[in-house]
Amino acid sequence: MEPSNYYSDQDVEKCVTVGETVLSDHPDIDLIICPDSTALPGQLEAAQKKDLTKDDVTITGFATPNAIKPYCEAGALYNWGLWDCKVQGALGCYLAYYLASGNDVAVGDVIDVPGMGLVEILPNDCLVPGAPTAEVNNGVVLLPERIIFTAENVDDYDF
């Protein structure tokens, strides 16, 4: 599959259309990993329009639990993920405090975040090697965990 043919530009309506195209162009497809939080509900909507369930094609990606809950309840997918907003907020606040306290950071540094553990400052291009950035390797921190949502735990979250 050529990815540029199926990207929906994070446009909600286009996501459904792109999802329908993927399913039509590849009727024997077994797995679809959606690239963004609008693509996942769009792809699931497209699958439902074709009366497909998680037993017909595995669809997953990242999106909020509230956006995907109806599809989960309908049996359209097994699981999906997203970063934990509380962990993301806590990490961002602590790193802001850490920097405001006069600490400098550089790629390769490891910071002990209370209640979270060690996080490392990674090069900007750690996810996409060679990707252009405004400053070379000024650093990023990846979240240490993500939430995996399932039919069993989706009701535990409201966002």
Model regions: which residues?
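A residue-level marker of the well-folded mature domains of exported/periplasmic proteins
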Residues: M1-F159
